[in-house]
Regions:
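C-terminal segment of N-terminal export signals and the immediately downstream linker at the start
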Residues: 27-59
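Predominantly extracellular/secreted and cell-surface proteins with exposed
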Residues: 85-216
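Short hydrophobic alpha-helical membrane-anchoring segments
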Residues: 19-29
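N-terminal secretory signal peptides and thylakoid transit peptides that target proteins
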Residues: 2-21
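General helical structural elements
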Residues: 11-17, 33, 285, 291
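Edge beta-strand at a domain terminus
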Residues: 229-293
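Extended soluble regions of mature proteins
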Residues: 196-243
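Short, solvent-exposed loop/hinge segments that bridge or flank secondary-structure elements
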Residues: 46, 50-107, 130
Length: 293
């Protein structure tokens, strides 16, 4: 920082702001200047080899390791109630993490397990909430943290995903499309749900990263940000009674290098309430698989 910039004070900043407003007012009376052309670059990325598509997807979503690795993502999301006969409305916020961990079990095939932890936050204040009012029933209910610890896991390869709760015969190829937007590479994708989950469940997301990082093949785990949505049933603790409908979540977040890098408030609560979820659950790999691969 040079000496002149170092002498900036609140008074000079306010004075500069006032002068800027005055200049904008004067400029508003003049003929508007023509905006320079700044056309958005938008292209689709195509890969001839399915193996290349899989590798790039794994770099974006997880980590293209040679043996085993893990990926930690952190997110905020807003939960909406979609009840029959009523306009959708936002009910609460969540803050949470997904920790996934994976091992190579065959050439370019990974066994993947994961767990999720999310805490309810007040929709207006953003503070952690122990109770919320359910507008459908008019009752105040106690909130529960959301823990997803029973995902059976998947096998992932260029051929598709095989859920470990199945017989291994069905490969499910996820929807995914890579595209370029200016200096970003984006991945639009739809995740497949375990076979025993509600048939209405679906999750889609968009992940993005700087193009120069994407093109650097030495980076096995790209530092992506992401946003997306998913549909899921009413949570049991909401006590919805006979109401028909479902929930809709909109989320956004990013990869985090390690648990110590999580936001302080979230990290401190998890260290107190669920410290075991701040590390991979490698014991999941000891569970036998029903089929050969």
């Amino acid at each position: 920082m040079n000496e002149k910039m170092g002498r900036l004070t609140r008074r000079t900043l306010l004075g500069s702001a006032a002068a800027a407003v005055g200049s904008m007012t004067a400029a508003g009376r003049a003929a508007p200047a023509a905006m320079p052309l700044s056309r958005v670059r938008s292209e689709f990325l195509r890969f001839d080899d399915p193996a290349d598509v899989f590798k790039q997807h794994f770099r974006m979503e997880r980590d293209l390791v040679d043996r085993e690795g893990s990926t930690l993502t952190w997110y905020h999301w807003t939960a909406f109630v979609i009840a029959e006969g009523r306009a959708p409305f936002p009910l609460m916020r969540y803050e949470g993490i997904e920790y996934s961990y994976f091992r190579v079990v065959a050439p370019l095939e990974y066994r993947i397990h994961a767990h999720n932890l999310s805490y309810v936050r007040d929709l207006t204040t953003g503070r952690f909430a122990t109770t919320i009012e359910n507008p459908i029933t008019g009752r105040r209910v106690a909130t529960r943290s959301t823990l997803l610890l029973n995902d059976p896991g998947t096998l992932a390869s260029p051929r598709g995903f095989r859920n470990l709760a199945g017989d291994g015969k069905q490969y499910r190829q996820p929807y995914r499309l890579f595209r370029v937007e200016d200096n970003l590479v984006k991945l639009d994708s739809v995740r497949t749900a375990p076979p025993d989950w509600p048939v209405t469940h679906i999750e889609n997301s968009c992940q993005w990263v700087d193009a120069d990082l994407f093109e650097n093949c030495t980076i096995s785990s790209l530092p992506v940000h992401f946003a997306g949505s998913y549909v899921f049933p009413f949570l049991e603790w909401l006590e919805m009674g006979d109401a028909k409908g479902h929930m809709l979540g909109f989320f956004d977040g990013r990869k985090v290098n390690r648990p110590e890098d999580l936001p302080r408030e979230f990290l401190e609560r998890t260290e107190r309430d669920h410290p075991e979820l701040l590390e991979p659950r490698w014991g999941e790999f000891e569970r036998p698989i029903k089929f050969l691969f």
